[in-house]
Amino acid sequence: MAWIQLKIDTDNQHAEQLSDMLMELGSLSITYEDGKDTPIYEPNLGETPLWSHTVITALFEADYDLAPVVEMLKLQPYLGADFSHKIEQVEDKDWEREWMDNFHPIQFGRRLWICPSWREVPDPEAVNVMLDPGLAFGTGTHPTTALCLEWLDGLDLQGKEAIDFGCGSGILAVAALKLGAAKVTGIDIDYQAIDASKANAERNQVADKLDLYLPEDQPADLKAEVLVANILAGPLRELAPLIAEKVQPGGLLALSGLLKEQADEISQHYAQWFDMDAPVHKEDWSRLTGRRK
């Protein structure tokens, strides 16, 4: 089955109003795109921010008459009679197959591979983490996740205990266990992340070595030799004392989820507890590492 889509240029002040109107006029779905490559990094809790220049795509059935829709939109004062829009035919595809074809095994560091379950493992002798993309959690493709995986690959984790602070999909926790850690504790504020981490640990046969907690349930005396936190700069700053007290003296720390321009400030903040290393960058993102004093 083919489809037809209507693309409209608008701004963030009118995007939701326009979306509601398009749905009332028969659209089957609405998507938002950034019209000018303007990044949004850290929205406030409960906010769904949109770009100042937003492109709305409304999908309709192929035989739907869009002429009345366009005429109705021309009457809206925030668009005007000459509003920017485009109508395109969209061929139906096996979207699931196309989505799966876009994911390939990825190597991080020297030993570690992240592999989708439907792909053949490139190196059976390597440390292979089987992880399928799903939900809004890390799969290794984001620079911050990659930075943390590369750091873990470079450590001697044999027999050590680690903490994955903000575990998300559990990718870092599972990788640490596959790299030799004796035990990992994963902490996250989202119960969906706890479920995702558990499922991924089971898929990789390491669930018996992974303890998972919501913050309010974690042991009061929790400490480890290694802690990795791939969250955002704001929480990293606010939770610094809590994170620091979870790392044993001489233990190792890795922080990511922060932008290049945020790295120096966060590093200085943690320097009261850790001997901090120089930041490592990948694209616009940074990783900070240090050793507990």
UniProtKB/Swiss-Prot annotation:
Annotated signal sequence range: none
GO CC terms, sorted: cytosol
InterPro entries for the chain: Ribosomal_L11_MeTrfase_PrmA, Ribosomal_PrmA_MeTrfase, SAM-dependent_MTases_sf
Catalytic activity: L-lysyl-[protein] + 3 S-adenosyl-L-methionine = N(6),N(6),N(6)-trimethyl-L-lysyl-[protein] + 3 S-adenosyl-L-homocysteine + 3 H(+)
Top-tier EC class: transferase
GO molecular function: protein-lysine N-methyltransferase activity
Its job: Methylates ribosomal protein L11.
Protein name according to UniProt: Ribosomal protein L11 methyltransferase
Organism in which the protein naturally occurs: Shewanella loihica (strain ATCC BAA-1088 / PV-4)
